[in-house]
């Protein structure tokens, strides 16, 4: 049986961190590393690391550790970084522009094809050589172009409408920055980034720390 088919969501959530640290090790010309050494760098227990990496195959060798290059390549493959995803951004405000300007976007395999907005002052603006288009034209664009991922950076009141349009046009991946839970078919994958919820989580944790000090 292919172990990759049984990777849990918890492991998937940890994969980007493995990717980041393995990239750093490669840049430092590190050829191999033990689970104990990786544990000290990444913050997971050595046992957890061994369990996680066992999902990908038999990469560790007793007395040798992990081959950093091989493991990095496999993590990249699991994360889908060996592919290129056609991507659009809907909403060219502060968050949308920040994402469009992210220098590693293309390197990670996300090819930004278009940006859309409703604001006439933003339409025609170029961000990283990608022109902001009128959102009224998004339907026609999607009918002519195969897009894999839609990045939603619009106010919550407009998010579901935008979601419905891109899903109707066979966009199966959504990165949602709008502070609302979207309704989508089962075959559409939504990754929510609710900034306010993250900030409130931090606030709650700080409050607990402060209580323990009182």
Curated annotation (Swiss-Prot):
Task: Tell me which UniProt keywords the record has, alphabetically.
Answer: Cytoplasm, DNA-binding, NAD, Repressor, Transcription, Transcription regulation
This protein's major location comes to cytoplasm
One cellular component (GO) term of this entry: cytoplasm
What is the protein's species of origin?
Clostridium acetobutylicum (strain ATCC 824 / DSM 792 / JCM 1419 / IAM 19013 / LMG 5710 / NBRC 13948 / NRRL B-527 / VKM B-1787 / 2291 / W)
This one is known as Redox-sensing transcriptional repressor Rex
Source domain of life is Bacteria
What is stated as this protein's family in its record?
A: Belongs to the transcriptional regulatory Rex family.
Q: Please give the Gene Ontology molecular function terms for this protein.
A: DNA binding; DNA-binding transcription factor activity
Q: Does the keyword Lipid biosynthesis apply?
A: no
> Mind telling me which SUPFAM superfamilies this protein's record contains?
NAD(P)-binding Rossmann-fold domains, Winged helix' DNA-binding domain
Annotated binding of NAD(+), by residue: 91-96
Entry's Gene Ontology BP terms? negative regulation of DNA-templated transcription; response to redox state
Q: Name one Pfam family in it.
A: CoA_binding
Q: Which InterPro entries match?
A: CoA-bd (IPR003781), NAD(P)-bd_dom_sf (IPR036291), Rex_DNA-bd_C_dom (IPR009718), Tscrpt_rep_Rex (IPR022876), WH-like_DNA-bd_sf (IPR036388), WH_DNA-bd_sf (IPR036390)
Give the SMART domains listed for this entry.
Answer: CoA_binding (SM00881)
The beginning of the lineage is:
Bacteria, Bacillati, Bacillota, Clostridia, Eubacteriales
Q: Which residues bind DNA?
A: 17-56
Function, as annotated: Modulates transcription in response to changes in cellular NADH/NAD(+) redox state.
- Give the quaternary structure: Homodimer.
Subcellular location(s) of the protein: Cytoplasm
């Amino acid at each position: 049986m292919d172990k990759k088919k049984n990777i849990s969501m918890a492991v998937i959530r940890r994969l980007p961190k493995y990717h980041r640290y393995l990239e750093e090790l490669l840049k430092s010309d590190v050829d191999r590393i033990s689970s104990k050494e990786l544990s000290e760098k990444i913050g997971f227990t050595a046992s957890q690391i061994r369990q996680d990496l066992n999902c990908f195959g038999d990469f560790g060798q007793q007395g040798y550790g992990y081959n950093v290059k091989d493991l990095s390549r496999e993590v990249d493959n699991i994360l889908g970084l060996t592919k290129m995803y056609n991507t659009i951004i809907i909403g060219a405000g502060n968050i949308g522009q920040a994402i469009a300007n992210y220098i590693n976007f293309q390197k990670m395999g996300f090819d930004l094809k278009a940006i859309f907005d409703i604001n006439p002052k933003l339409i025609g603006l170029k961000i990283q050589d990608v022109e902001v288009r009128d959102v009224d034209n998004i339907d026609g664009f999607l009918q002519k172009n195969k897009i894999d991922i839609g990045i939603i950076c619009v106010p919550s009141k407009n998010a579901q409408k935008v979601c419905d349009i891109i899903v109707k046009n066979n966009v199966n991946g959504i990165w949602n920055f709008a502070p609302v839970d979207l309704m989508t078919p089962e075959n559409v994958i939504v990754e929510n980034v609710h900034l306010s919820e993250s900030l409130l989580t931090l606030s709650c944790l700080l409050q607990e720390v402060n209580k323990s000090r009182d």
